[in-house]
């Protein structure tokens, strides 16, 4: 699996400025005011550090597997109209709270055929209307078998910064890190109809390690 976008995957690079800032503030307060005043700031710094953790994951070898693009909880498994490719599709949505790992990983092997970015609102990402009203970044990925998958990063109530490191024409491997959403969010995956679905509403999933569905 390529790690070219994340040279240090244990701590996501998107968090380095926040982590550095939190620790510098804690150090300065400790130097000038002592441990008592600095302790709450050290706790905040540790929380920021854990938020941006980005541990490596084991990639399943199951042929035809569609992997979870993020850690979190399943909030939707619906037959819908894919708004990006104008087709009937199965939508599986993963909601990330502030305690989940927020690195986003490719659900399938394939070439990025197109990409769309939409500014929008910052509604609670667990709400259904967040899929079409919130700020979002969508990737159209086509597998070597010609199957189309749409993976959509969606900003949430707290998350207001979507990061995507890939572009049309590039190839993604299953489980490859391609982006990050800071401070809570959601990822929607639109799949062709007729998939074997392996998850249900309320299930907790782990990015890359959980198989959301399988191509038949």
Swiss-Prot record:
A Pfam match: PS_Dcarbxylase
Cofactor note: Binds 1 pyruvoyl group covalently per subunit.
InterPro entries given in the database record: PS_Dcarbxylase, PSD-A
Cofactor: pyruvate
GO molecular function list: phosphatidylserine decarboxylase activity
Record localization: Cell membrane
Pathway where it operates: Phospholipid metabolism; phosphatidylethanolamine biosynthesis; phosphatidylethanolamine from CDP-diacylglycerol: step 2/2
Reaction it catalyzes: a 1,2-diacyl-sn-glycero-3-phospho-L-serine + H(+) = a 1,2-diacyl-sn-glycero-3-phosphoethanolamine + CO2
GO biological process, one term: phosphatidylethanolamine biosynthetic process
PTM text: Is synthesized initially as an inactive proenzyme. Formation of the active enzyme involves a self-maturation process in which the active site pyruvoyl group is generated from an internal serine residue via an autocatalytic post-translational modification. Two non-identical subunits are generated from the proenzyme in this reaction, and the pyruvate is formed at the N-terminus of the alpha chain, which is derived from the carboxyl end of the proenzyme.
Top EC group: lyase
Main location: membrane
Active site: 185
Modified residues (Pyruvic acid (Ser)): 185
Keyword Membrane: yes
Keywords annotated in UniProt: Cell membrane, Decarboxylase, Lipid biosynthesis, Lipid metabolism, Lyase, Membrane, Phospholipid biosynthesis, Phospholipid metabolism, Pyruvate, Zymogen
EC number per UniProt: 4.1.1.65
Membrane topology qualifier: Peripheral membrane protein
Site (Cleavage (non-hydrolytic)): 184-185
GO cellular component: plasma membrane
Biological role: Catalyzes the formation of phosphatidylethanolamine (PtdEtn) from phosphatidylserine (PtdSer).
Assigned protein family: Belongs to the phosphatidylserine decarboxylase family. PSD-A subfamily.
Subunit-level organization: Heterodimer of a large membrane-associated beta subunit and a small pyruvoyl-containing alpha subunit.
Protein name listed in UniProt: Phosphatidylserine decarboxylase proenzyme
Gene behind the chain: psd
